[in-house]
């Protein structure tokens, strides 16, 4: 993992053909820099990489440690987050770019009587923050527990501003939340009276 390029070189000699290899050694690293990370600090991610300044870059080791970063994001629920690019600049600094799968928007669908804000205010997953499956699951439970819906589902759509982002669509199936009260009364002036009251509680 210490070489970026290995090329065979064949040379004719009296005994036949001599085989040599021309190698390009990976650069010596002077540090590591992270871009796009908000969930974990650069200090925490630097500990994941464990790169010592002055060492020749080992691409195999870097690949393994990058997978460790991806696994940490996934373990904590950030299922769309991953290392998106790695490069070494002329000064030997290793730059690691991370995309975290930002939620661009949260859009209710299927609600005809229930106002959008009644649904979205129950979401603990917020717009502008990295998508987290645990927060989305809790949000769906909160929406369902409102008692207005027979079914609540989430669809993930590609982001419009950035394909690495996501738009959350909350698809709900409303049940009848209206209440009807029937009653009857009697007065000397009006005789028998009917009482009908109708109310909606999902506003």
Predicted features by range, described:
Residues 1-192, 197-200:
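Periplasmic polypeptide-binding modules associated with outer-membrane biogenesis and secretion
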